């Protein structure tokens, strides 16, 4: 930890790996998304390890779910996105895959939220856009956001950039982040490393630092 102008400046991962400084964000680990990702089961397993480590020390946990609006509430942007993802040129062929109570929208059973976890539904790619996430983090005095889930190139990179713009420090658990397109996911990870504002690590390192923070006097 460094200091400037009387303020702490976290520079090492260990500076943020404790229950007071950081929250764990599990991004869009939904039944209908897991099945679209190569290696989805592996990402679930890695997220589960991170989640168990966070819960063991009482770290705050937040889940996001991507929603689709009913067609009556789909506007131009939502139709354009859905047409792209569903590989159709006709708006009439679009199906709202992730309606609020649809089975595909549910969090995967291996990672079910508890009553102590925050679950936020969103329409945008960034976990901060249109949700109270930033307010909730600031209200709890949280600086760091450890992020895992699916997909790196679709929503995790935008969330990381948005987090930095809002004054939070993103921690990317790289081996717990899946991608729908391997090359695009790799480019996103390389871009985040190049920009340098996010801390990039792996789940086992993160879990070990959490355990150490809990056992330290």
PLM region spans:
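Active-site-adjacent betaalpha module
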Residues: 1-23, 49-52, 56-57, 74, ...
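A short alpha/beta connector and helix-capping loop motif
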Residues: 20, 38-54, 58-67
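Short beta-strand segments at enzyme active-site cores
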Residues: 26, 59-66, 72, 173
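A generic "binding-loop/recognition-motif" signal
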Residues: 29, 67, 152
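Short acidic, Gly/Ser-rich segments with clustered Asp/Glu that frequently serve as metal-coordination loops
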Residues: 30-35
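Short, solvent-exposed loop/turn segments at secondary-structure boundaries
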Residues: 36-40, 183-184
């Amino acid at each position: 930890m460094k200091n400037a102008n009387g303020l702490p400046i976290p520079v090492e991962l260990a500076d943020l790996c404790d229950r007071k400084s950081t929250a764990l964000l599990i991004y869009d680990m939904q039944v209908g998304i897991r099945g679209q990702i190569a290696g989805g089961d592996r990402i679930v397993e890695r997220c589960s390890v991170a989640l168990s480590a966070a819960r063991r020390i009482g770290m705050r946990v937040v889940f996001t779910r991507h929603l689709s609006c009913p067609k009556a509430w789909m506007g131009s942007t939502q139709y354009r996105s859905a047409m792209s993802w569903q590989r159709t040129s006709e708006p009439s062929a679009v199906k709202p895959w992730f309606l609020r109570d649809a089975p595909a929208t549910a969090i995967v059973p291996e990672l079910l939220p508890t009553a102590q976890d925050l679950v936020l539904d969103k329409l945008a790619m960034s976990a901060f856009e249109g949700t109270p996430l930033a307010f909730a983090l600031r209200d709890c005095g949280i600086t760091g956001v450890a992020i895992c889930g699916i997909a790196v190139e679709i929503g995790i990179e935008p969330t990381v950039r948005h987090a930095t713009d809002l004054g939070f420090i993103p921690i990317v658990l790289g081996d717990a982040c899946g991608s729908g397109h391997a090359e695009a996911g790799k480019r996103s990870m390389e871009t985040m490393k190049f920009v340098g504002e996010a801390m990039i690590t792996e789940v086992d390192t993160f879990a070990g630092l959490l355990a150490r923070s809990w056992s330290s006097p």
